[in-house]
Amino acid sequence: YHLGGPPVTLKLPPGTPAGRTMRARGKGAVRKDGTRGDLLVTVDVAVPQHLSSEAREALEAYRKATADEDPRAELFKAAKGA
């Protein structure tokens, strides 16, 4: 679906999970009064099915470099505080 106007670019915060909905204020469809509504964008993460050996090596290097980090720690902390 094309809303007209230039493409919209969103900057996603690091760690944004798949399924999160982001709002781009004033970037949506044109209303009857001529103003634009908000554009809601749902993050969809595409995971490659096949990796080249170079890409696989890069991911392995990244895994080793971040071995001490637990990306789920923040999720658990947020869930306990909610």
From Swiss-Prot:
Pfam families: DnaJ_C (PF01556). One of its GO terms (biological process) is DNA replication. Its cofactor is Zn(2+). The keyword Chaperone applies. InterPro entries: DnaJ_C (IPR002939), HSP40/DnaJ_pept-bd (IPR008971). Keywords: Chaperone, Cytoplasm, DNA replication, Metal-binding, Repeat, Stress response, Zinc. Binds 2 Zn(2+) ions per monomer. It is found in: Cytoplasm. One of its GO terms (molecular function) is metal ion binding. Participates actively in the response to hyperosmotic and heat shock by preventing the aggregation of stress-denatured proteins and by disaggregating proteins, also in an autonomous, DnaK-independent fashion. Unfolded proteins bind initially to DnaJ; upon interaction with the DnaJ-bound protein, DnaK hydrolyzes its bound ATP, resulting in the formation of a stable complex. GrpE releases ADP from DnaK; ATP binding to DnaK triggers the release of the substrate protein, thus completing the reaction cycle. Homodimer. This is Chaperone protein DnaJ 1.
